[in-house]
Amino acid sequence: MEVQLTNRQQHILWATVRHYIATAEPVGSKALVEEYDLGVSSATIRNVMGVLEKSGLLYQPHASAGRVPSDSGYRIYVDQLITPSLRSRSVSQTDATRTETLGREIEVALQKHLQWEDRSLETLLQGAAQILATLSGCISLITMPQTTTALLRHLQLVQIEAGRIMLIVVTDGYETHSKLMDLSPIPEETQRDSEVIDRELQIVSNFLNTHLRGRSLLELANLNWSELDQEFQRYGEFLKNSVAELTRRTLAPTATQIMVRGVSEVLRQPEFSQLQQVQTIIHLLEEEQDQLWRLIFEEPEPEDIGKSRVTVRIGAENPLEPIRTCTLISSNYRRGSIPVGSVGVLGPTRLDYESAIAVVASAADYLSEAFSYFNP
């Protein structure tokens, strides 16, 4: 059920979250009066905090303590309260420009990596992961890219035996994919003449290379084959189905290595004081990367392809048990409009959401630019 807050409740929830993020200590009304220009008395703040607690947005760790945000409180903070007008209510006016400043910092840092003489994409991603961990103060996660946007370099149809041919596809990264196909749709009298088949397959191969070289495999999977010329038409139906199956099989996202940086610093924070919790998180990062990859690499809906989107999962919103007390912020980086990898940060729910979201968004945009640079 969606919680409707008054302006005063919003401001006090915002200040409580900000103060707890900064101090890691339960927040009392006196601290908010001293640190934030809320324009109300300490008694009023206590009353409002009590209402927020009853709504499930704050809670008391123990009876004599102040209050801390719940997962639901953080969710409202992220979805509704991170706005310039609310940030400007802080005594410290630097909060109002922190997002823009951090965005520029990561842009400058990543631009420096883009100018390296060693223009290896893997080297760039390693550097980006370290920068992301440093600027966010979180564990950084960057997945190695998918081959979903590989371009067709060469296509060849080869007769293997009577009635069977092999389709061979070579991508711009020199990866080879093949599929064995049955020639049963072709008239029997043609199948019996092996030389005729060889000549026709070469003609079709040449024709397809001329018209399709340089296209992405995604385009091939969705190609309107009926637009191609007459030389192709006699082989049309089975090639259409076979190429579509081959390219879709190649395009299916598969878990890739996740580059992880910043673990030791984050795990020193008070939220990770329990050794068993630390061990389960490290095990996930090192031994269960497939599960984590499926969580941070999101295939967009067709209407969202090409759009930048940052996903924030807070606490129990994470389906993986080891990180159900953590926040995971992630976004895809793209080649053109197609997502090929993900960038993210993992930290306690008590993290600087404004900064972390800005850093992840900037990193994803720059990795998209870099991927196009290294793979024009």
Swiss-Prot record:
Domain of life: Bacteria
UniProt organism field: Nostoc punctiforme (strain ATCC 29133 / PCC 73102)
Pfam family, any one: HrcA
GO molecular function terms listed in the Swiss-Prot or TrEMBL record: DNA binding
Function (record text): Negative regulator of class I heat shock genes (grpE-dnaK-dnaJ and groELS operons). Prevents heat-shock induction of these operons.
Record-stated family: Belongs to the HrcA family.
Coiled coil: none
Protein name: Heat-inducible transcription repressor HrcA
Protein's UniProt keywords contain Transcription regulation: yes
HAMAP family per the UniProt record, alphabetical: HrcA
Keywords tagged on the record: Repressor, Stress response, Transcription, Transcription regulation
Entry-linked InterPro entries: GAF-like_dom_sf (IPR029016), HrcA (IPR002571), HrcA_C (IPR021153), WH-like_DNA-bd_sf (IPR036388), WH_DNA-bd_sf (IPR036390), WHTH_transcript_rep_HrcA_IDD (IPR023120)
Upper lineage: Bacteria, Bacillati, Cyanobacteriota, Cyanophyceae, Nostocales
One BP annotation, GO: negative regulation of DNA-templated transcription
Keyword Repressor: yes
